[in-house]
Amino acid sequence: FVTSFDLAVLNLEGTVTGNESLSLKDKNILRFTFEPIALDAVFNTGFDIVSLSNNHTSDFGREGFLETTKNLEARNLKYFGDYFNESETLVVEKKGLKIAFVGFNEFAYKNFDQVLERIKKASNENDVVFVFAHFGEEYKDFGNSFQQKNARMFIDSGADAVIGAHPHVVQNIEIYK
């Protein structure tokens, strides 16, 4: 099914390391990590791109994040949304279109203006811009005012679509502009 699409993007909500899924400080706190072999299933299922724009890609610090990107690169999986570097944008060409992927993580990014500038730049240089925004409240089936306000600012800055994640439930869709 996934292979029938021109591009398929997956939100990788955790690291890909050899670590155990336990906090180093408190054994009662789970930290999300996957065995590297799990990426073989991601690749074989047909996913092309992985979003790392979420609140669990830092569960094992910068070292765990770098191990994750190394594991992705070993399987030729493209990625975007560096938890530690707000300036990253992924651009891929597909069927003659330049498509930009910009990650936004409510829990990591400190410089919101920089995110808007990245979207503007991506819009000026590419045909399509997708913003993957990791934001909102867990288990709420309707987006909050923060999500709506920021998603609209992303669109106003040049994004063609904003895809949200984090709440663990399906939320509403808004057609804006």
What are these regions (language model features)?
Residues 1-177:
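Acidic, metal/ion-coordinating pockets
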